[in-house]
Amino acid sequence: MTDSLVLSLAKDLIARPSVTPIDEGCQKMMAEFLAPLGFEIEPMVFHDTTNLWARRGTTGPVFCFAGHTDVVPSGPAEKWHTPPFEPTIIDGMLYGRGAADMKGSIASMMAAVQRFTTDYPAHQGSIAFLITSDEEGPFINGTPKVIETLEARQEKITWCLVGEPSSTNHVGDVVKNGRRGSLTGDLTIYGIQGHVAYPHLAENPVHLAIPALNELASKQWDQGNEFFPATSFQIANINSGTGASNVIPGEMQVQFNFRYSTELTDSQIKQQVAAILDNHGLRYELKWTLSGQPFLTGSGKLVEATQNAIKAITGQETELSTSGGTSDGRFIAPTGAQVIELGPVNATIHKVNECVRVADLETLSDIYYNMMQQLLVDHD
């Protein structure tokens, strides 16, 4: 039996061991597929990262498919049922690293676009692809750099569909219409090193820090809102001491992270943290890393088209959610684009034996096609 177009594309992509930030020719394959469909191909390489901007059409509105060709490492290959970079179908499931996150989505996008441009060669506006090999890594030279380039030449995205695996039990049951912000603090608290038998001659930074850390951990930062849960503070790493049991440490390192809602800004969080540390009289140094601002796509054409398409293809209603981690949508939303995430079931992402139901990729492609019909075809 001959593979469908979606399955053939997915297998081709999975077979390329594109561990971040290596692309392994995935984007070249995509470019060769899209160019005959009328797409202008623009590779954007920044340092070790390969990016692709492909666009069909010169006018607005711009419907953009966004995603990444890089994958996380496979882990021990011997723990997989099948080799992680040899796409294999077992009982209707396609196994391989990247099957769900997110080469399956990319294959569904490509097949949907081929079908749509064949059926509607004179569609309204433009269709674009923004693809990077740096989503699973440090996300420095990927989507942020492409967006900088587009913004510099005033090239705007109207609607953006990120193919991250958003679904929980079946395709389309959950759509991400926003994400929480992520802010990490690296805190060093200073004391005075000394002998444990002479505590009066030392200052133990661990003892000094505990009350402040307890206040940070127990504080209700906000109540959240109808779209976002309350802001979360979590301590990720703590390090102090020399390893000797008779030495009071001279300093203590604490790393913590905020996942925050639209009820707070990163500036407000920084100010409140500093106030708590200062109130406890600590001597400290604090460095911040902002991974992304929170964003929300409320009611509008993109959300409406997404809900309608899922209902039309699957017969099911969808849940709008902002839960989970960050995605590259956080770099696209600040440009003013409406952004949603819609992809396959995420139960096996980043795991051994990552897999996706083959039928789900076909369903996903049909949903993507339906969305383009709603947004890029004149129905008058």
UniProtKB/Swiss-Prot annotation:
Residues annotated as binding Zn(2+) 2: 101, 136, 350
Major enzyme class: hydrolase
Zinc is among the record's keywords: yes
Reaction(s) catalysed by this chain's protein: N-succinyl-(2S,6S)-2,6-diaminopimelate + H2O = (2S,6S)-2,6-diaminopimelate + succinate
Alphabetical list of InterPro entries matching this protein: ArgE/DapE_CS, Bact_exopeptidase_dim_dom, DapE_proteobac, Peptidase_M20, Peptidase_M20_dimer, Peptidase_M20A
Pfam families documented for this protein: M20_dimer, Peptidase_M20
GO molecular function, one term: cobalt ion binding
EC number annotated for this UniProt entry: 3.5.1.18
Taxonomy, superkingdom: Bacteria
Record's cofactor remark: Binds 2 Zn(2+) or Co(2+) ions per subunit.
GO terms of biological process kind: diaminopimelate biosynthetic process; L-arginine biosynthetic process; lysine biosynthetic process via diaminopimelate
Active site: 70, 135
Pathway listed: Amino-acid biosynthesis; L-lysine biosynthesis via DAP pathway; LL-2,6-diaminopimelate from (S)-tetrahydrodipicolinate (succinylase route): step 3/3
UniProt keywords, alphabetically: Amino-acid biosynthesis, Cobalt, Diaminopimelate biosynthesis, Hydrolase, Lysine biosynthesis, Metal-binding, Zinc
Annotated residues for binding of Zn(2+) 1: 68, 101, 164
Its job: Catalyzes the hydrolysis of N-succinyl-L,L-diaminopimelic acid (SDAP), forming succinate and LL-2,6-diaminopimelate (DAP), an intermediate involved in the bacterial biosynthesis of lysine and meso-diaminopimelic acid, an essential component of bacterial cell walls.
Subunit structure: Homodimer.
Protein family (similarity comment): Belongs to the peptidase M20A family. DapE subfamily.
Protein name as it appears in the record: Succinyl-diaminopimelate desuccinylase
